[in-house]
Design a protein with these regions (language model features):
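Generic alpha-helical secondary structure
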Residues: 2-10, 66-69, 73
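Short acidic, glycine/proline-enriched loop segments that cap or flank alpha-helices
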Residues: 49, 120, 229-233
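Short low-complexity stretches enriched in small and charged residues
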Residues: 11-22, 56-63, 86-90
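A generic structural signal for short, solvent-exposed coil/turn residues
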Residues: 18-20, 53, 96, 124
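Polyanion/phosphate-binding surface patch
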Residues: 25-69
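An acidic, glycine-/histidine-flanked metal-binding catalytic module
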Residues: 2-7, 16, 126-277, 281, ...
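Long beta-strand-rich cores associated with HINT superfamily self-processing modules
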Residues: 62-184
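Surface-exposed, low-hydrophobicity interaction/linker segments
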Residues: 4-43, 254, 271
């Protein structure tokens, strides 16, 4: 197998997500010849030239926070050729509870050669696609158990409605916990705002992977003596930051750069304008929309 092809694809995915700064873990696999043969032999009539196997390459992205799923999905759909008709994106209903899927199918890059990793006898029924599943860290373990002990053993669960519902109920509990987690960090951010701990307020409000910058201390000290500006920072919408990051080249993410973005977008504070590097202003002007 040509592992370099797979690693290059994963690097492209990571660069796309890293540009947003969101917290995540990534897992991936390439179906082995044995696994591929097993899948085909299990139902020989299922796959043909009109219905091909689309998950030769499988990727899972487990996000720390549930509100980042749509943000990452949109970024990936901009980066790769998305195939909506083959993807599964569930909309939860109020009447029932069950796992919601966000299984996305994309075209493989033109540089990716299926023939290098698939035996000639199978190539006609392998699509030049990869499947990417978006999940949360809290739901990841549940999905693993579900896949190995329910999906792969469907016969063991036939007629066991009570047990199926109870198992789905575990997922519902995790889903509730995910929203509770978001609320907790909102409250943490507010507490630090009231205590004028600007750095902690930002870390808990943004929930992004931030790196230190030599301008951070200067910016934080400036904010501490400008209480009205602190209030504006606290009220600034996190989704707006993610939108700006997703429509521009990758930027080193630091507390100071995030504040500079807020300022050029909304505050137009003279003191912050004086501190803002020209490189960041050029970055701001490079929006793709």
């Amino acid at each position: 197998m040509n592992n370099n092809q797979l690693l290059n694809l994963i690097s492209d995915i990571e660069r796309c997500i890293d540009s947003l700064g969101v917290m995540y873990r990534i897992f991936y696999r390439e179906k082995s010849s044995h696994s591929l043969s097993e899948k085909i032999n299990k139902d020989p009539e299922k796959y043909n030239a009109n219905k091909k196997i689309q998950d030769l390459i499988g990727v899972r992205v487990a996000l720390y926070f549930v509100d980042d799923i749509d943000v990452v999905r949109n970024a990936l759909q901009e980066k790769f050729q998305f195939i909506p008709e083959d993807s599964q994106i569930d909309n939860p209903t109020v009447e029932t509870f069950s796992a919601t899927r966000c299984n996305l199918v994309f075209r493989l890059p033109d540089s990716f050669s299926i023939s290098e990793i698939v035996e000639a006898r199978h190539q006609a029924i392998i699509d030049n696609t990869f499947e990417l599943q978006l999940r949360t860290i809290l739901s990841e373990g549940w999905h693993e158990v579900d896949h190995d002990l329910r999906f792969k053993c469907k016969g063991d669960w036939i007629g066991l409605d009570k047990e199926n519902r109870a198992f789905n109920g575990v997922y519902a509990t995790l889903e509730t916990s995910e929203w509770t987690l978001l609320k907790l960090f909102e409250e943490l951010s507010y507490t630090h705002y009231k205590n004028k701990n600007v750095k902690a307020m930002l870390i808990n409000k943004l929930r992004l992977r931030l790196k230190p910058s030599n301008k951070d201390d200067e910016v934080l000290e400036y904010l501490k003596v400008n209480e009205k500006l602190i209030k504006k920072v606290f009220r600034y919408d996190r989704d707006s930051i993610l939108k700006h990051l997703s429509t521009r080249p990758k930027l080193p993410l630091s507390i100071s750069n995030i504040i500079f973005i807020m300022n050029v977008d909304s505050f137009n504070d003279h003191g912050l304008n004086e501190m803002t590097p020209s490189l960041l202003r050029n970055w701001w002007e490079s929006s793709s929309i």
